[in-house]
Amino acid sequence: MNSAALEGGFTAPPQQSAQAFRSVMQAMARPGRIYDIEGAVPPAPISIAAGTTLLTLADPTTGVHLTESFDKKEVRDWLTFHTGAPLVSATEAEFALGYWDELDTQAYQLGTAEYPDRSATLIVEMPELSQAGATLRGPGIETEAHLNLPEIALFKANRALFPLGLDFIFTSGARVAALPRSTQVS
């Protein structure tokens, strides 16, 4: 492991992890809203938002899958040192990190009827986040919200699987938004 892996974590772990957790949970509770998130300084190509999200949610009991662009020694070492999370295949992952075109959504766990919570959460690195584009409705949204999603049909199909399905966290720079499986997309 190189010394760069030791850097870039939370400098004030209790405060930063609590603030980051709140940002991620707010994003999940209010689909379509974009929140600022910071704390981590991960190696490229991980954004501040994705790195901070991983430091907040991943631990030694949660398998993380890295897509091709992120599956680099520096990233693996950094993630392992700061979270202890095992690096796993897509079929075993609780969390996955990647660009949209690299995430094979068919490969990840959708949960079961007995345990719908045993599904994967995909952390999708986006070029930008904006409250425009797809229309979102459902829990946590007063009337409707908007978010630039990479592909509307897939999110509609994912919603049809509810209570099974994938959850999505979108990151760009130091900003985060989310799309839980319960959200209707049009």
Q: What does each model-identified segment do?
A:
Residues M1-G63, T67-F70, F81, A174-R175, ...:
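N-terminal, charge-rich interaction modules
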Residues T61-T62, K73-S186:
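Internal, well-folded beta-alpha domain core
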